[in-house]
């Protein structure tokens, strides 16, 4: 008994769109078909050991509180009411017995079930595309369809597609998803689900974040109120997230909760804002992308709106970030004229990645290196507020930082020489004491000068 051959026979008989179903065999005993309904999955299978058809809701939608699945189960229960059935208490699974020795009859029954399912769920069914198996597929043909809000994408493996693609020569598909405004919001059953983003309403994405997140000026963020708040001047510390984990959880991917304990050592009256870098595959370091040309303006408006909400003067605002978060901090601090502290920021040295692009930064509208080379020509060299960068000569990012310093001498550079720092990745964790000192000095308006620190 060849279950794979039987499965193909079922697909041939069923009058359904083969691009809207994923077919696989479980444990050499179950024929399984998965359907994607926006951001959640429904599976229909036939178990050879249990001789039963099974209908299962694999996960819950994060955006829709009302699922069509319970109604679908009720419909299936009525259509196949003549067979012995069982439904779980949560109404996320239904089975009915179909004991039949003739596989041709099982194929006919299964193909009919697939047709019934496809018709009932048609309005919510989404494409599931294996871009590795079907290498000639034109992904743009699907992404350009205005009715496509969600799409499932996978390779031959079951790994999260953003990770899988960069290791299997499929990065061009990720660039295409980025440039069309599709972000990964789920991964289940070996399929990564991408959702079309409305670049004028990032608030729509809050469903994928916890209740502690907010949206303002198309920026998603958290706020940590001052532990001590008095009538004296109020301060604002805006923290950029650095690139985080590669998985389907948007919080893990776009938000790193930078400086988690800074509130224990910050001066009173300081609101701490932590921004999520929600764009492209792993964020855009606070810069415009080929899809969204408004990110930089959104962030500048965001900071000004925060100042207005909390009653903070510009001179009492400090922007901060480390590594890729430092990229956004330096850029927005310079163009906005804010006090800034950046820890070993990435300024476009792609040699660090060995000539590869694991973070899909080629989807950024202007290459980062080019952006920072042009920046000195478009900002005021007489910086009203201090911009401080810390780095180490052994860091892979140091040459670009030094070049920016030469183009903008008013930028303050704190250079480290410390045996525990041998490369970029060592820097942030070994300089917490300095970071806290510099941030507090900026908040207190204490002047900082270039320094060469040997430890």
Q: What are the residue ranges of the model-derived segments?
A:
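Short, surface-exposed "cap/lid" segments of acyl-processing enzymes
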Residues: 220, 224-267
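Gly/Ala-rich beta-loop-alpha elbow adjacent to hydrolase catalytic centers
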Residues: 321-325, 329
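Intrinsically disordered, low-complexity regulatory segments enriched in Ser/Thr/Pro
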Residues: 40-100
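Alpha/beta-hydrolase fold nucleophile elbow
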Residues: 312-322
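The feature captures the conserved acid-bearing segment of alpha/beta-hydrolase catalytic domains
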Residues: 355-417
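Cap/lid segment of the alpha/beta-hydrolase catalytic domain
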Residues: 272-294
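Alpha/beta-hydrolase active-site loop
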Residues: 289-309
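C-terminal catalytic histidine-bearing segment of alpha/beta-hydrolase fold enzymes
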Residues: 410-455
